């Protein structure tokens, strides 16, 4: 494994030297590794972290983020709410796509329309948008169906694409991943961001070279000074041991997901440092509460998860403190809430777990008609979240103690996400980040009924549906101030009462890197190499 890392790194360094010579800057290559690889490079297809962590180096939205995740001007230099349902964005001038095409107002109109198409997984960010209109070459208005007080925050995740380039490559709609569609945008990009795609070999390496024409290199992107990295070489390395060996030997500079059991060794290792902080991400166990009969269970003719007592039983059978202490080695924040504390709308009084109580769990199962338990299959990724497979292994053992015999089906993120997006699951582990830093994003994506508006229930593969919850989510979309917070608070209470999920914990995210690399640690677990400095 290390041999091919060496060979790839040498090739990348040679490529970086050529690029740096052409751009007049000293070559600074960062070799980056994590366990998983993006399953697409289409900027409007898959709203998952393994995709966005790469694409944010290449593409940009009208609004971007500072290192502290606060909104900042991106391809729009300013914006204002002209009317309750009309936002105006003033576009940055002189910007070109990596292919040479000028960035125009028509590209903005096209990009928002593309993100609204049925094959897009980004409907949650554009659900209130009726249409975008080019006022003139430098101005775009976004007209919403209803007042949307957090629109600028939501569209940070909507990246701008070149309309002519998309049309030329028959890519005017997002890739349909459910149909396993292969399009030009799966392996090719054309953004305006700080880095452009140089090499894409799925599951092997992705090389991104500095875009010397990027506007932000002139220090125009907030208070954080720009970095000096001229090239990024990303390699998925599934093996924890190999990934850490590569870092310790100096063959990798940055590891996004070091295993928790290696942190103490990394902290004391020469030439290596560890950055740590809380992530805006919560892990849950999600039940299929929609089907009349589970796909993967020995219970026939009914769905045990439709019974609140069964969901409560499996919740109370989980010793979350044991998972925190042993599986996560203290690197988690135990929660009873849908959202973490950093998210707008969080209510501490609603962050209360059902107590761990195996006797109560057995009693609830018996009351529900399952005195001897039942069998079910738990779906779990094995390379997406910190210790994801180990968490699922611990839970299956805990459920077995109350009579629920659980088969664990763990797999890499690409087939795992494809499976749950086909509704081919009975119960599964999900981690959910909140890029908007607002509670609506989680409620609308995970708990809104799937027959609602655009973006509603887009990740609600448990098919939870509650009319009152839908009403509260509708209020969150349009109301402001105390009325909006009251809706969020009631929804958090209803979430606790209905138990559509078992909330587990918020992740703590360690990053491991060589000491000659400096990069701001981000709570969304997304490395921004535009601010990285390599010495």
What are these regions (language model features)?
Residues 80, 124-174, 194-201:
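Surface-exposed binding/hinge segments that line
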Residues 183, 213-265, 308, 396, ...:
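Ligand-site clamp/hinge motif
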Residues 33-83, 113, 190:
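N-terminal lobe/hinge region of extracytoplasmic solute-binding protein
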Residues 511-535:
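Long beta-strand-rich cores associated with HINT superfamily self-processing modules
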Residues 88, 309-312, 316, 324, ...:
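Extracytoplasmic/peripheral linker and loop segments enriched in polar/acidic and small residues
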Residues 195-196, 316, 333-367, 384-389:
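Structural transition elements
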Residues 70, 158-233, 358-359, 363:
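Gly/Pro-rich hinge or "lid" segments in bacterial periplasmic/extracellular proteins
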Residues 46, 278-296, 301, 415-477, ...:
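Acidic-aromatic pocket-rim loops
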């Amino acid at each position: 494994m290390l041999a091919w890392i060496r060979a790839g790194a040498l090739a990348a360094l040679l490529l970086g030297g050529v690029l740096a010579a052409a751009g007049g800057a000293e070559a600074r290559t960062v070799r980056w590794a994590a366990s998983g690889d993006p399953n697409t490079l289409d900027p409007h297809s898959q709203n998952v972290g393994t995709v966005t962590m790469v694409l944010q180096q290449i593409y940009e939205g009208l609004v971007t983020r500072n290192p502290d995740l606060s909104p900042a001007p991106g391809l729009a230099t300013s914006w204002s709410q002209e009317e309750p349902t009309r936002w105006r964005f003033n576009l940055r001038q002189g910007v070109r796509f990596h292919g040479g095409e000028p960035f125009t107002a028509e590209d903005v109109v096209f990009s928002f329309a593309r993100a609204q198409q049925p094959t897009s997984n980004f409907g949650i960010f554009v659900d209130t948008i009726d249409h975008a209109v080019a006022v003139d070459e430098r101005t775009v208005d976004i007209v919403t169906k209803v007042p949307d007080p957090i629109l600028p925050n939501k569209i940070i995740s909507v990246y701008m694409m070149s309309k002519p380039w998309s049309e030329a490559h028959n890519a005017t709609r997002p890739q349909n991943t459910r149909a396993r569609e292969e399009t030009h945008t799966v392996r090719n990009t054309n953004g305006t961001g700080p880095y452009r795609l140089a090499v894409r070999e799925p599951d092997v390496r992705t090389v991104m070279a500095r875009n010397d024409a990027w506007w932000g290199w002139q220090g125009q992107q907030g208070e954080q000074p720009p970095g000096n990295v001229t090239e990024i070489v990303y390699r998925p390395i599934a093996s924890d041991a190999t990934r850490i060996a590569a870092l310790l030997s100096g063959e990798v500079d940055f590891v996004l997901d070091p295993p928790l059991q290696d942190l103490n060794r990394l902290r004391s290792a020469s030439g290596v440092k560890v950055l740590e902080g809380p992530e805006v991400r919560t892990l849950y166990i999600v039940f299929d509460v929609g089907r009349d009969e589970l796909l993967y269970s020995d219970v026939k003719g009914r769905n045990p998860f439709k019974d609140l007592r069964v969901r409560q039983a499996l919740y109370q059978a989980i010793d979350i403190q044991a998972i925190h202490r042993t599986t996560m080695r203290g690197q988690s924040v135990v929660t009873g809430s849908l959202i973490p504390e950093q998210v707008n709308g969080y209510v501490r009084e609603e962050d209360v777990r059902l107590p761990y109580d195996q006797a109560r769990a057995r009693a609830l199962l018996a009351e529900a008609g399952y005195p001897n338990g039942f069998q079910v299959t738990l779906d779990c990724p094995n390379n997406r979240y910190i210790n994801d497979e180990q968490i699922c292994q611990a839970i299956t053992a805990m459920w077995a103690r109350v009579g629920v015999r659980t088969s664990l089906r763990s797999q890499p993120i690409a087939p795992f996400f494809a499976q749950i997006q086909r509704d081919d699951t009975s119960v599964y582990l999900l981690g959910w980040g909140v890029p908007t830093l607002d509670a609506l994003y989680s409620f609308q994506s995970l708990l809104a009924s799937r027959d609602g508006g655009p973006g509603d229930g887009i990740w609600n593969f448990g098919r939870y549906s509650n009319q009152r919850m839908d009403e509260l989510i509708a209020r969150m979309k349009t109301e402001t101030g105390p009325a909006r917070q009251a809706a969020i608070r009631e929804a958090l209470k209803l979430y606790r009462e209905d138990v559509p999920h078992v909330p587990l914990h918020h992740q703590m995210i360690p990053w491991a890197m060589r000491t000659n690399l400096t990069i701001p640690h981000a709570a969304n677990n997304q490395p921004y190499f535009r601010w990285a400095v390599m010495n």
